[in-house]
From Swiss-Prot:
Reported function: Catalyzes the saturation of all-trans-retinol to all-trans-13,14-dihydroretinol. Does not exhibit any activity toward all-trans-retinoic acid, nor 9-cis, 11-cis or 13-cis-retinol isomers. May play a role in the metabolism of vitamin A. Independently of retinol conversion, may regulate liver metabolism upstream of MLXIPL/ChREBP. Required for adipocyte differentiation in a 3T3-L1 cell culture model. This effect seems not to mimic the in vivo situation in which animals show increased adiposity in the absence of RETSAT.
Name of the protein this chain belongs to: All-trans-retinol 13,14-reductase
GO cellular component terms given for this protein: endoplasmic reticulum membrane; nuclear membrane; nuclear outer membrane
Enzyme class: oxidoreductase
Organism: Mus musculus
Subcellular compartments: Endoplasmic reticulum membrane
Cofactor requirements of the protein: NAD(+); NADP(+); FAD
Gene that specifies this protein: Retsat
Length: 609
């Protein structure tokens, strides 16, 4: 029996090797053949210099000739895909509907200060980490990362018996010790949990492999239960976070504390997979970082690489549709320019606009109903939306005693029930029952802030929302949604500010202005369907091994590819993985192997120095 199993295993390995060679052994240039990192140059603060990179408005004369690809959307998924292709010698045009490139990495001005739109903190940005290495290669090492304070996160539990605080310290040992100090009677549970997090997170390469292998093969492996049997990551993708914590025997309060980070992926513990949660915990466990100079530095240092290869990144370029030829293959895009449409032709179209925008709005009506398109859409639904609050403060971080720590404020240990009650409430009552708040001080995270904005500071807060509360105004123009809309939005803002001022009483009299952005704001500026913060919902259905294998860069439409967070996971690093998967599919190269080889080469060179 065991001999038969061994022979079958060997046969499977041979088949996998041949399939892999056939799919990813092309002769495309290696974009990661050489280390392009160089010492960071001084921060560019000149507004005109930054505008030339980040705000190149669309015009026909600025469209490069003989394009190799067009990318829809300039978030990190789109920019990274374009940059990798540019490094392989491709001429790529990136089209952004907003006035500024960057997607969730762009910044905007409010009352003379700068706010980020989506980058609150990133993990594993120390020298030597793979995420840092990838970003160094697409920005030539010009992104500098500032470490945040330890604890990087502070969970605050407001209850009938007062306030409890649970710090999350940088460093695995310190992180675990911090938990055990708060839960001395549950040390064994904490040890089991942390070991499971480590084992599952290390298996994330299995999720990548699922998207590399032919779909029929992954379906076969899934059908016979081989994925969940041999892969801890795939197995954890079929178990909810709540289920795992209950099996470990954690108390209700410990379950809440271990689940505190769920707003970073937008799904409550009973509805998300433990695999995703483990990835996020492992991502931050060594500490958190913030881009020096703010999140717009990411786009600012990625775009020049695209331009040097003959490409361009153009803003104010709303793509109306993906063009198809007579054989049903993507062959370009149609861009709205004033009242006219401009057709741009190219052999490859990459969409960073997300699955819903791409399949439901950018494709011709007949193609939207293709069985394979409908199958993919049936696996996902729009994710959680949030209300953003942007607060301008008078005073430095020292004056105001502000830390670079993030604050997660909860009012109930049963996060699932609290959220379910909240989102099912009538919109008029909901502001009185906000279940959680995320609070951060971006100005305290950036070491260049004081030089750029002396004697002033910023605070941001995020509040979960039901899109249905704002749905009636979605057809109304921005800025003209009426008194009822503003009243509802302000009710959430005022309720949040009441909590914030109790937590930070030193800010009394220091608040200069408060601005709220509803899910409709997200929908308008980021083209996020239903204002979804993280694209497709990161629930158990989406993270099931079958769905992970099915949702990939290649689409049912030849020459049309997806990139970004919808084909891997949310966040900067998730979208970056989506870009690598997309670029690998287009170049027919395993870029992960290329990066690994370059990393080994760089390490060997450093040893000789």
């Amino acid at each position: 029996m065991w001999i038969t199993a061994l022979l079958l295993a060997v046969l499977l390995l041979v088949i996998l090797h041949r399939v892999y060679v056939g799919l990813y052994a092309a002769s495309s240039p290696n974009p990661f053949a050489e280390d392009v990192k160089r010492p960071p140059e001084p921060l560019v603060t000149d507004k005109e210099a930054r505008k030339k990179v980040l705000k190149q408005a669309f015009s026909v004369s600025r469209v490069p000739e003989k394009l190799d690809a067009v990318v829809i959307g300039s978030g990190i998924g789109g920019l990274a895909s374009a940059a990798v292709l540019a490094k392989a010698g491709k001429r790529v045009l990136v089209l952004e509907q907003h006035t500024k490139a960057g997607g969730c990495c762009h910044t905007f001005g409010e009352n003379g200060l700068e706010f980020d739109t989506g980058i609150h903190y990133i993990g594993r940005m120390r020298e030597g980490n793979i995420g840092r290495f990838i970003l160094d290669q697409i920005t030539e090492g010009q992104l500098d990362w500032a470490p945040m304070a330890s604890p990087f996160d502070l969970m605050i539990l407001e209850g009938p018996n007062g306030r409890k605080e649970f710090p999350m310290y940088s460093g695995r040992k310190e992180y675990i010790q911090g938990l055990k100090k708060k839960f001395p009677k549950e040390e064994a549970v904490i040890d089991k949990y942390m070991e499971l997090v480590k084992v599952v997170a290390r298996g994330v390469s299995h999720a990548v492999l699922l998207k590399f292998l032919p779909l029929p093969l992954t379906q076969l492996l899934s059908k016979f239960g081989l994925l969940t049997r041999f892969s801890p990551f795939c197995r954890a993708s079929t178990q909810s976070l709540a289920e795992v914590l209950q099996q470990l025997g954690a108390s209700r309060e410990l379950q809440a504390v271990l689940s505190y980070i769920f707003p970073t992926y937008g799904v409550t513990p009973s509805h998300t997979a433990f695999s995703l949660h483990a990835l996020l915990v492992d991502h931050y466990i060594q500490g958190a970082y913030y881009p020096r100079g703010g999140s717009s530095e990411i786009a600012f240092h990625t775009i020049p690489l695209i331009q040097r290869a003959g490409g361009a990144v153009l803003t104010r370029a709303t793509v109306q549709s993906v063009l198809l030829d007579s054989a049903g293959r993507a062959c370009g895009v149609s861009v709205k320019k004033g009242q006219e449409l401009v057709n741009i032709y190219c052999p490859v179209v990459i969409s960073n606009a997300g699955m819903f925008n791409t399949y439901q709005h950018l494709l011709p009506e007949t193609v939207r109903h293709l069985p394979d398109v409908k199958k993919q859409l049936a696996m996902v639904r729009p994710g959680l939306s949030m209300l953003s609050i942007f607060i301008c403060l008078k005073g430095t971080k020292e004056d105001l005693k502000l830390q670079s720590t993030n604050y997660y404020v909860y009012f109930d240990t049963d996060m699932d029930k609290a959220m379910e009650r909240y989102v099912s409430m009538p919109k008029e009552k909901a502001p009185e029952h906000i279940p959680l708040l995320f609070i951060a001080f971006p100005s305290s995270k950036d070491p260049t802030w004081e030089e750029r904005f002396p004697d002033r500071s910023t605070m941001t807060a995020l509040v979960p929302m039901a899109f249905e509360w704002f749905e009636e105004w979605q057809e109304e123009p921005k800025g003209k949604r009426g008194v009822d809309y503003e009243t509802l939005k302000n009710a959430f803002v005022e309720a949040s500010m009441s909590v914030i001022m109790k937590l930070f009483p030193q800010l009394e009299g220091k608040v200069e202005s408060v601005t709220g952005g509803s899910p409709l704001t997200n929908q308008y500026y980021l083209a996020a369907p239903r204002g979804a913060t993280y694209g497709a919902d990161h629930d158990l259905a989406r993270l099931h091994p079958h769905a992970m294998a099915s949702i990939r860069a290649q689409t049912p439409i030849p020459n049309l590819y997806l990139t970004g967070q919808d084909i891997f996971t949310c966040g900067l690093m998730g979208a970056l993985q989506g870009a690598l998967l997309c670029s690998s599919a287009i170049l027919k190269r395993n870029l992960y192997s290329d990066l690994q080889a370059l990393g080994s080469k760089v390490k060997a060179q450093k040893k000789k120095m």
